Swiss-Prot record:
Keywords: Cell inner membrane, Cell membrane, GTP-binding, Hydrolase, Membrane, Nucleotide-binding, Protein biosynthesis. The lineage of its organism: Bacteria, Pseudomonadati, Pseudomonadota, Alphaproteobacteria, Rhodobacterales. The gene is lepA. Its EC number is 3.6.5.n1. GO terms for cellular component: plasma membrane. This is Elongation factor 4.
Amino acid sequence: MPRMTQLDLIRNFSIVAHIDHGKSTLADRLIQLTGTVAERDMKAQILDSMDIERERGITIKANTVRIDYPAKDGRTYVLNLIDTPGHVDFAYEVSRSMRAVEGSLLVVDASQGVEAQTLANVYQALDAGHEIVPVLNKIDLPAAEPERVKSQIEDVIGLDASDAVLISAKSGLGIPDVLEAIVHRLPPPKGDREAPLKAMLVDSWYDAYLGVVVMIRVMDGVIRKGDRVKMMQTGAVYGIDRLAVLKPQMVDIAELGPGEIGVLTASIKQVRDTRVGDTITHEKKGCAAPLPGFKPAQPVVFCGLFPVDANDFEALREAIEKLALNDASFTYEMETSAALGFGFRCGFLGLLHLEVVRDRLEREYDLDLITTAPSVVYQIYMKDGTLQELHNPTDMPDLTYVDHIEEPRIRATIMVPDEYLGDVLKLCQDRRGIQLDLSYAGARAMVVYDLPLNEVVFDFYDRLKSVTKGYASFDYQITGYREDFLVKMSILVNDEPVDALSMMVHRDRADMRGRAMVEKLKELIPRHMFKIPIQAAIGGRVIARETISAMRKDVTAKCYGGDATRKRKLLDKQKAGKKKMRQFGKVEIPQQAFINALKMDS
């Protein structure tokens, strides 16, 4: 069984890149070149284990691999690569992974240049005190401009890129130079073997056979199989059943020392019992203080998930419980809706997280789902001095008791080619944005806006992509709460409120949103035998109305000539019947109408 490795022979690093700049391909090449995985087991994006990660070309969970590399100086180094998610929703996972390593490879596409997510992740790496080695990928493309991109890295990020490593991850060009740069330009970890055990919990996932598998980075001390360890945030104590390193398959190891990254299993039942960023120490003679910077994951965006077929509710419950085993940041509770039946109110870290969870439920568990309009968490300050959190617009308290409402704001960084800048500024302005900064890097502009999260969760990203023909990149951080004039808009169909369509809107935009919603519903709801009013209302005040006219039979068809009062009598009789029908009639709203109304392009 392999033993511990000396500190000066370890290099821990992560790869920072924007989506599609070749991060996972580079990881594949490093693994391939060092023979870590046999050729026959090699597949593209080997560290992305979920189908959805491969398909969307994104990394959702942090993954790790230990590579043994015989360097040119004759010594064999242990390289631990943590493949981090690049997307903003998973920013906390990124920050923890960053704290677990000492250096980063900054991968930039030599034809595209620096993008918004590259920036966000580089700043996180710099915050974590990383040494950063710039790597320019795709230099074999005809459109590659390494010199322009080098100067862009220096201008935008302020890193010296003169000795950037030039590679093509696809063809394997320049990969040996990357390995040498990791060994010689990134620092070895620090740590004290004799000190009490202090290890950081970097990630955890659920395995059907082993229970919860926990990935750790040892800071000080030594951890061995059979030790009793304690999680400092939850206070739970476990006995270690198995210690291993990932190559990417598990290889058992007797002990892990300072600077090493590995995994352990300890009969832990749920991923919720392990908090990313927690500190692990020995039950007896443990370390005095936990590692700084821990914070529990807080859901930011909420939406309702309902099965299209009510009989699938139990299947949905099972699927959600299984997913939650593996995703501690995903929260759920049951909810009922008059329009959609039984379902769940779920909380997510952001829009991509919501899409990924929904896709996984539909794909892995074969469910048909309706997603209600995503909403954010509002803070409602009541007149009696109490504070309520509002996750679902239907739970909005009576406005007479409300003092004011605060909504979450974000700081959005958008990188966009110059010619689309005007459209992007207009889009942000329309979404109640406040411009904070505008700067240029070559032919690309970088705009920083303060925006309400409520305006972004709906369809901001899609609109941004369409006004910029797909060239803009977008990244955001949540900055805090601010008071604004927000109201709850209800939709009434035939004078009955439809809970699934109610939403929180800004007072100035309510009329526009209301009008668009009722016009859309008028197209979507089929005609009935009686006329149906569709209204958008704030409190008791109707702000927009459309009427779906009734289908009617020509009751006077059988009257030939003769007296007009005969026709009148038949028409009045029909009118009275329609009135009675409207009183007792139920309006059937088809599922498709809900789905389309919630996709509304505002």
